[in-house]
Regions:
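NAD(P)-dependent Rossmann-like dehydrogenase/reductase catalytic/cofactor-binding core
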Residues: 19, 25-47, 52-55, 256, ...
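A short helix-to-beta-strand connector/capping loop
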Residues: 119-128, 192-194, 236-238, 363
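Rossmann-like NAD(P)(H) cofactor-binding subdomain of soluble oxidoreductases
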Residues: 123, 129-138, 142-213, 229-231
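General beta-strand structural signal in soluble alpha/beta enzymes
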Residues: 170, 195-200, 240-244, 303, ...
């Protein structure tokens, strides 16, 4: 006869195994281990923990026994801004997430979830929410800005009256429409005296919320600011590396969106691994050429904010830019694709900006120009791709130096590309 105590133990064991299987099925085995270790580190003891679980539990216990006393504001309630604010709150920082809509703020505070961008993921109960911009940024140590690129300048102007020593960190990837300004350029223009940095890397918000191990790069000329951001966000799940190459890190985060669109289009045509590898490596070459022209260190593109972010964005169907590209590849118009996505896809604007800049500077960027032809000149994607493959002979590893090859011939070649491979009545457009 089984005793009540043994029965309870068996039930607990069964429940634990069910939790384990559910977590690993949803998030992956490694993330499941990390999640269980976190619970252990927060007071739920487990007998015979694995070495990984023990290490993570110790890390989380240290964080909660010695919380970082930084005062932080995160502006922008999208997926990435919310995920970063949640990390900071979990690390013990005094963290406020500012969202423009008052009704959304009330809903987030009540449910502790971001139902629009991160449905189903509970946020740390220490995270505070506000729609009052002045109150959100006053007396803070660091202000993280995670609004879309189109709203970045306006947001800086709105917080300018309340800046009195706070540092600014941009989480926004992309370029300002019509000016080609990076977010760091806008910060220097609007708030010339402020201490600032930019953060970028292979950071899909949903994976971060699932506690899947991830990493990012904080770039700033200020070593104290780099260290402060590392202290605020670094954990067993999320590593923060430092760099002083602001331009390179920022360009990596902006340019990779172009090639995520290209990869999404390629996926729609069900290409093989050879094609994907070709796109990825030639994209890296284009990024580095362009970066050198803009004053970046080409080696930065071999790090997390370059090839790391490029790989993650080009490999994931979670990427907004990948999804835009996939819809384009299936015959949908750019306007219809953007409408269906319902979120900002920075790569669409970036393609236009980089195409114009590269054409003027004579930087060899055939993939970028091909995408411009498809999106802005209504060229047939398949026809442009075929002409791209027929382009002249090139060297392979040439991306560590700026390229002086003119794009005039390539541009002229694409303008003459036929449109007979494009369907006039695509079902996806209806």
């Amino acid at each position: 006869m089984t005793s009540p105590n043994n029965s309870n133990k068996n039930n607990i064991s069964a429940n634990n195994e069910t939790d384990k299987e559910s977590s690993e099925k949803q998030n992956g085995m490694l993330a499941g281990i990390f999640e269980r270790a976190t619970k252990s580190g927060l007071g739920r003891k487990k007998s015979n923990p694995s070495p990984v679980e023990s290490a993570v539990a110790k890390d989380m216990a240290d964080i909660h026994s010695n919380p970082t006393k930084l005062r932080l504001a995160f502006l922008g309630g999208g997926s990435f801004g919310t995920a970063m604010a949640n990390l900071a709150a979990r690390n013990g920082c005094d963290t406020t997430l500012w969202v423009r809509n008052k009704r959304t703020v009330k809903a987030m505070a009540k449910t502790q979830t971001n139902k629009k961008y991160l449905p189903g993921y509970k946020l740390d109960d220490r995270l505070k929410y506000s729609h009052d911009l002045a109150a959100s940024v006053k007396d803070k140590d660091i202000i993280f800005i995670a609004v879309p690129g189109l709203a970045f300048r306006e947001t800086l102007k709105n917080i300018a009256p309340f800046i009195s020593g706070q540092s600014i960190v941009s989480l926004t990837k992309g370029m300002e429409k019509d000016t080609f300004a990076m977010m760091s350029d806008i910060i220097k223009e609007v708030l010339p005296e402020v201490n600032f940095g930019v953060m970028s890397g292979p950071n899909l918000a949903i994976e971060i919320m699932k506690n899947m191990p991830s990493a990012t790069v904080i770039a700033s000329e200020s070593e104290p600011l780099r260290h402060a951001v590392q202290a605020a966000l670094h954990s067993a799940f999320f590593r923060v590396f430092a760099s002083d190459d602001i331009r390179g890190v920022e360009l990596g985060g902006a340019l990779k969106n172009i090639y995520a669109i290209a990869m999404g289009m390629a996926a729609a045509y069900e290409v093989g691994e050879n094609t994907k590898a070709m796109i990825l490596t030639r994209a890296l070459a284009e990024m580095s050429r362009f970066g050198v022209e803009e004053g970046a260190n080409p080696l930065t593109f071999l790090g997390l904010s370059g090839v790391g972010d490029l790989y993650a964005t080009c490999s994931s169907e979670l990427s907004r830019n990948y999804r835009i590209g996939n819809m384009l590849g299936r015959g949908m118009s750019i306007d219809a694709a953007v409408k269906k996505l319902g979120q900002t896809a920075e790569g669409v604007n970036t393609i236009q900006q980089v195409h114009e800049k590269a054409t003027k500077a004579g930087i060899y960027m055939p993939i970028t120009h091909a995408l411009y032809a498809v999106i802005y000149e209504d060229k047939a994607a398949l026809g442009v791709a075929l002409h791209l493959m027929e382009a002249g002979f090139r060297s392979d590893v040439e991306f560590v130096m700026a390229h002086d090859h003119s794009n005039a011939a390539l541009t002229a070649h694409m303008k003459t590309s036929g449109s007979n491979t494009k369907s006039k009545d695509s079902d996806a457009d209806k």
